[in-house]
């Protein structure tokens, strides 16, 4: 694959779409360092599109988790990695391996298959794979619950929990 980085003077926004996919660790580190230095030197923002949560942890201040073409959770890097609310976000995080972890626990894959985006579901796109799915999840897109000015989640389960605490 050929990778091209195009930078114009006074760039306010850099969009990096899977910039480290299929790169070895050394080249990946160099690409991330370049992106970070471009950000710092030009005082620009970066939209990082990636499946690599390790890259997200190293480079991103704010994170939007998408599933089935919808943002299901958005927050600061700390809120997403340490205070995640959405079942999909929690499932993603449970799939991250820690090389320093000596436990024999197996990774827990998220069961099921992603939705057909040519025929998207009416309700929550994660419904068919969610272990907490309720009837309303299949019927309607969830509204967004705000936990802080920077942390929101779109999930009927979370709304039900929040309502029971009021």
Task: Set out the residue ranges of the language-model regions.
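Intrinsic disorder/low-complexity segments enriched in polar/small residues
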Residues: 2, 12, 29, 160-163
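Charged, flexible cofactor/metal-binding loops and thiol motifs
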Residues: 76-166
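Serine/threonine-rich, low-complexity intrinsically disordered segments
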Residues: 4-6, 22, 160
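P-loop NTP-binding/switch modules centered on Walker-like glycine-rich loops
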Residues: 15, 19, 23, 27-105
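ABC ATPase C-loop
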Residues: 6-9, 13-14
């Amino acid at each position: 694959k050929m990778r091209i980085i195009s930078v114009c003077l006074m760039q306010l926004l850099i969009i990096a779409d899977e910039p480290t996919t299929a790169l070895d660790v050394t080249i990946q580190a160099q690409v991330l360092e370049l992106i970070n230095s471009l950000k710092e030197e030009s005082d620009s923002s970066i939209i990082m599109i990636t499946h690599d949560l390790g890259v997200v942890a190293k480079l991103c201040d704010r994170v939007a988790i998408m599933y089935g073409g919808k943002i299901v959770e958005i927050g600061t890097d700390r809120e997403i990695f340490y205070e995640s609310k959405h079942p999909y976000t929690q499932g993603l995080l449970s799939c991250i391996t820690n090389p320093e972890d000596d436990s024999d626990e197996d990774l827990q894959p998220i069961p099921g298959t992603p939705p057909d985006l040519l025929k998207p579901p009416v309700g929550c796109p994660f419904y068919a794979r969610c272990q907490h799915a309720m009837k309303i999840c299949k019927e309607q897109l969830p509204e967004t619950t705000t936990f802080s000015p920077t942390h929101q989640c779109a999930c009927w389960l979370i709304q039900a929990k929040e309502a029971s605490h009021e």
